[in-house]
């Protein structure tokens, strides 16, 4: 009998040992840790500029928003830019690009570069006021005809309903005067922006690229790419020449191919 129990005990010990050495296939395997390589762009791009965040923010882009025919007052997506960060009072900006600008401004300041906002969101009516002022200006009244006049104005100014500033994603910084950007301070600021703006989600839409059409180079104009590209895509799909009206010269939008030449004339 003792031998019998001894044999049973030996069998149990062997079974347990084999179970330890060869665990059941139903047992949960040990977790495997996978280390992914993270690109520099991922590390330096603000979290709010992710495609998911932008999709949520921009899932309801209306024609009115694309054309600037709305007011940001009372819209919780917009903020009033503090006066110490801008040249003029009462400027609005979409809060996502503005948060990114704050981070960019702080980084620039540490490098000894000053960034101040000179223009941000502009409504259709704001742009119309700029347009009408230039239309009546003596600088353009001597133009041979309306087409020549419009092309002269549109070297640096957009027709109402075609400006990227309608989207709340664009910022003009420091100065729109060429003399500033040709100064030592301006050159330093521009070089810093060229080297660092992308880290905060911004890029220059109007460059000196030879293949680009439309407006002249604007070193002061910086666009929040993750959002503005979605507005751009929506604009091209939604807006036609018939939608751009209500100001002097608007009857020539189609013949001048304003959407193709100017709205689409950006660097990406």
Predicted regions and their residues:
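Extracytoplasmic cell-surface/polysaccharide-interacting catalytic and binding patches
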Residues: 11-120, 124-268
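N-terminal Sec-pathway targeting helices
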Residues: 1-10
């Amino acid at each position: 009998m003792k031998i019998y129990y001894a044999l049973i005990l030996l069998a149990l010990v062997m079974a347990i040992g084999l179970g330890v050495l060869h665990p059941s296939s139903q047992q949960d395997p040990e977790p495997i840790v996978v280390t992914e390589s993270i690109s520099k762009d991922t590390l330096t791009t603000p979290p709010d500029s992710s495609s998911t965040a932008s999709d949520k923010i921009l899932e309801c882009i209306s024609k009115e928003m694309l054309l600037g025919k709305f007011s940001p007052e009372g819209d919780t997506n917009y903020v009033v830019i503090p006066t110490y960060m801008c040249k003029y009072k009462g400027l609005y900006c979409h809060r996502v690009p503005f948060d990114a600008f704050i981070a960019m401004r702080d980084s620039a300041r540490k490098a000894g570069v000053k960034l101040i906002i000179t223009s941000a969101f502009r409504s259709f009516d704001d742009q119309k006021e700029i347009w009408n002022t230039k239309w009546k200006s003596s600088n353009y009244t001597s133009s041979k005809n309306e087409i020549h006049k419009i092309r002269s104005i549109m070297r640096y100014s957009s027709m109402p309903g075609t400006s990227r500033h309608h989207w709340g994603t664009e910022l003009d910084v420091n100065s729109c005067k060429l003399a500033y950007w040709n100064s030592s301070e301006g050159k330093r600021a521009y070089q810093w922006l060229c080297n660092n703006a992308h880290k905060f989600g911004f890029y220059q839409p109007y460059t000196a690229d030879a293949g680009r059409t439309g407006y002249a180079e604007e070193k002061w104009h910086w666009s929040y790419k993750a959002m503005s590209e979605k507005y751009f895509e929506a604009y091209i799909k939604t807006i036609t020449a018939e939608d751009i009206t209500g100001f002097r010269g608007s009857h020539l939008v189609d013949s001048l191919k304003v959407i193709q030449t100017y709205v689409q004339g950006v660097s990406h």
